[in-house]
Amino acid sequence: MELQLVREYGARPWDGVVVPLGEGDLEGYQGPWEKELAAVRASGRFAGKAGEIYRFSALTEGGLTQIFLLGLGKNWDLERVLDDCAKVYRQCQELRLGAVCTDLRGLEPQFTPALFQKAAEAAALTGYRFDKYKTVPTPAGIRTAAFLCEESERYEAALAEAEVSARATCIAVSYTHLTLPTN
């Protein structure tokens, strides 16, 4: 899986867009889906509570895009961000969305590089598959996970650390699969 930082949505059609929002920060998002988010907010279906995921579809120039609102709650910690991001990226994978963009603009500057690293790790680990002994390999899911942020240079080192950490985790898990006795 390719991880990248982007400063704008650009011409690329995204199959899925993840919009993480803190509880009570639903007004902070400014982007192409402001009207849809306002309607969801008015309906009371999404409050931004930790682990809450709300999905809707939006018609864009590139076709139908799946929009995921991800609730981060009031207090963001590393493990919660890792777990909650992993949940939403697994949903993207199950829907076989090839290109997913996570829009962090509503969270900056509170979203620290350490929190960003956990979000990027979650995306990278979602792509892990151990298919060595399967007759039919698991179909590929997310090929590109991008993170949209205004201060991309702030997160460059964290992105590199996330890639290394995720790769090391995948190697360790693969090694475990190869060395454990089968019953």
Locations of the language-model features?
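Short amphipathic alpha-helical segment within the helicase RecA-like ATPase core
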Residues: M1-L178
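A short, hydrophobic C-terminal helix/tail in secreted or cell-surface proteins
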Residues: T179-N183
